[in-house]
């Protein structure tokens, strides 16, 4: 890939991200190939000086992965300025794709020192708390829809904001098949869902992200969210 173009496009996305601006759509080659998308994402993230408070999984809906012919989701960094407490207002634009109901976990910083292979059998010892959250998903580009998984991945994981609810101490409960709904209080519209849509279940999605950040040798040296 042309390093000069990579640097130019990443600078434009970073400027849009930090200054809450919109830019014209980036070249398709950065979206069509997920490897190029991840490279652009990492390049953009390396230029952000805001504190990282955690990571997110993106493209975890199995029907979406199948439709886009991708084998797995992606992950991206979440910054302090993009996390709001429940009840705060978020300004959106016409390029917002939607709102997703999520489960987030607070992970102990000693995870970064662990040499163990991450699995369902040992993952829970690293979790301190869990909380419901809403993710506002969208672009910093003037484009709509999702043609490639890289559309989401390349643009800071398509994360606009996270709204986090009240944290509770983690308990080993089965949340792999729970019905959910999001209600619009203004028009009374309700959108139904199920936790099983999140890469089989939320814990499976969590394990996916933890394996990726361990592979990439990331160490925040503090507790963090996923």
Locate predicted features:
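Catalytic-core "active-site belt" of small-molecule-metabolizing enzymes
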Residues: 2-201, 207, 215
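A conserved acidic, glycine/proline-rich C-terminal tail/linker
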Residues: 202-226
């Amino acid at each position: 890939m042309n390093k000069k173009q990579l640097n130019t496009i990443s600078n434009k996305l970073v400027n849009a991200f930090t200054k809450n601006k919109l830019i014209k759509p980036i070249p398709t080659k950065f979206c069509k190939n997920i490897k190029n998308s991840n490279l652009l994402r990492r390049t953009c993230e390396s230029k952000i000086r805001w504190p990282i408070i955690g990571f997110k999984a993106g493209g975890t809906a199995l029907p979406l992965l199948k439709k886009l012919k991708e084998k797995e989701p992606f992950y991206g960094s979440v910054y302090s300025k993009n996390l709001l407490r429940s009840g705060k207002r978020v300004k959106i634009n016409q390029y917002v794709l939607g709102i997703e109901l999520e489960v987030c976990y607070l992970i102990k910083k000693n995870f970064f020192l662990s040499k163990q292979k991450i699995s369902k059998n040992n993952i829970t010892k690293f979790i301190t708390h869990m909380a419901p959250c809403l993710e506002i998903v969208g672009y910093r580009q003037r484009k709509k829809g999702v043609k490639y998984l890289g559309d989401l991945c390349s643009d800071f994981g398509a994360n606009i904001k996270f709204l986090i609810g009240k944290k509770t101490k983690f308990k080993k409960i089965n949340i792999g098949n729970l019905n959910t709904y999001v209600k619009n209080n203004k028009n009374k519209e309700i959108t139904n869902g199920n936790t099983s849509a999140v890469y089989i279940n939320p814990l499976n999605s969590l394990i996916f992200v933890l394996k990726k950040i361990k592979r990439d040798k990331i160490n925040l040296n503090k507790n963090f969210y996923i």
